[in-house]
């Protein structure tokens, strides 16, 4: 079963959107298999955003992610990576469709509420960066037969 990493960023936590964001993925029928609220260290933030290390916004991105707690999550389900990207919306909230998380709640690209893995390889790397195997639950919700064939 496919898994993806999602992180509600400090702005989403501070704006009390954690429940609303989680609900969107639960309602879709995906399974939450890992969840933790945490203060991100600079070391973890730098590893997570290493692909942006040479970009001019790297330091401000690391500073933002470490400024306040985040909610790190692992979700599981058929097509969860692509579907999560659609639920999240475009990186720039001003370009995000209404009905998406960023389209409904975001205003600024620097405060776009949530991060989601962009593909299977990234998802695998991000899940293992943020969670140990022991922190992930292997379970099947009772509703699964009502969601997927």
UniProtKB/Swiss-Prot annotation:
<feature type="binding site">
    <location>
        <position position="102"/>
    </location>
    <ligand>
        <name>ATP</name>
    </ligand>
</feature>
<comment type="subunit">
    <text>Homotetramer.</text>
</comment>
<dbReference type="GO" id="GO:0006228">
    <property type="term" value="P:UTP biosynthetic process"/>
</dbReference>
<feature type="binding site">
    <location>
        <position position="85"/>
    </location>
    <ligand>
        <name>ATP</name>
    </ligand>
</feature>
<dbReference type="InterPro" id="IPR001564">
    <property type="entry name" value="Nucleoside_diP_kinase"/>
</dbReference>
<feature type="active site" description="Pros-phosphohistidine intermediate">
    <location>
        <position position="115"/>
    </location>
</feature>
<keyword id="KW-0547">Nucleotide-binding</keyword>
<keyword id="KW-0546">Nucleotide metabolism</keyword>
<dbReference type="InterPro" id="IPR034907">
    <property type="entry name" value="NDK-like_dom"/>
</dbReference>
<comment type="function">
    <text>Major role in the synthesis of nucleoside triphosphates other than ATP. The ATP gamma phosphate is transferred to the NDP beta phosphate via a ping-pong mechanism, using a phosphorylated active-site intermediate.</text>
</comment>
<keyword id="KW-0067">ATP-binding</keyword>
<keyword id="KW-0479">Metal-binding</keyword>
<keyword id="KW-0418">Kinase</keyword>
<feature type="binding site">
    <location>
        <position position="9"/>
    </location>
    <ligand>
        <name>ATP</name>
    </ligand>
</feature>
<dbReference type="InterPro" id="IPR036850">
    <property type="entry name" value="NDK-like_dom_sf"/>
</dbReference>
<feature type="binding site">
    <location>
        <position position="112"/>
    </location>
    <ligand>
        <name>ATP</name>
    </ligand>
</feature>
<feature type="binding site">
    <location>
        <position position="91"/>
    </location>
    <ligand>
        <name>ATP</name>
    </ligand>
</feature>
<dbReference type="Pfam" id="PF00334">
    <property type="entry name" value="NDK"/>
</dbReference>
<keyword id="KW-0963">Cytoplasm</keyword>
<dbReference type="GO" id="GO:0006183">
    <property type="term" value="P:GTP biosynthetic process"/>
</dbReference>
<keyword id="KW-0808">Transferase</keyword>
<keyword id="KW-0597">Phosphoprotein</keyword>
<comment type="similarity">
    <text>Belongs to the NDK family.</text>
</comment>
<protein>
    <recommendedName>
        <fullName>Nucleoside diphosphate kinase</fullName>
        <ecNumber>2.7.4.6</ecNumber>
    </recommendedName>
</protein>
<dbReference type="GO" id="GO:0005524">
    <property type="term" value="F:ATP binding"/>
</dbReference>
<dbReference type="GO" id="GO:0004550">
    <property type="term" value="F:nucleoside diphosphate kinase activity"/>
</dbReference>
<keyword id="KW-0460">Magnesium</keyword>
<dbReference type="GO" id="GO:0006241">
    <property type="term" value="P:CTP biosynthetic process"/>
</dbReference>
<dbReference type="GO" id="GO:0005737">
    <property type="term" value="C:cytoplasm"/>
</dbReference>
<dbReference type="GO" id="GO:0046872">
    <property type="term" value="F:metal ion binding"/>
</dbReference>
<dbReference type="InterPro" id="IPR023005">
    <property type="entry name" value="Nucleoside_diP_kinase_AS"/>
</dbReference>
<feature type="binding site">
    <location>
        <position position="57"/>
    </location>
    <ligand>
        <name>ATP</name>
    </ligand>
</feature>
């Amino acid at each position: 079963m496919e898994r993806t990493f999602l992180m509600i960023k400090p702005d989403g936590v501070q704006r009390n959107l954690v429940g609303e964001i989680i609900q969107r993925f639960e309602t879709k029928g995906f399974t939450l298999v890992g969840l933790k609220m945490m203060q991100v260290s600079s070391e973890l933030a730098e590893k997570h955003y290493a692909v942006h290390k040479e970009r001019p916004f790297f330091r401000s991105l690391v500073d933002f992610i470490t400024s306040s707690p985040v909610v790190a999550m692992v979700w599981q389900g058929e097509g969860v990576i692509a579907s999560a990207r659609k639920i999240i919306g475009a990186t720039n909230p001003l370009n995000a469709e209404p009905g998406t998380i960023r389209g409904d709640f975001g205003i600024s690209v620097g405060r776009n509420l949530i991060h989601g893995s962009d593909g299977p390889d990234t998802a695998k790397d991000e899940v293992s960066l943020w969670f140990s195997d022991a922190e992930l639950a292997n379970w099947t919700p009772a509703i699964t037969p009502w969601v997927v064939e």
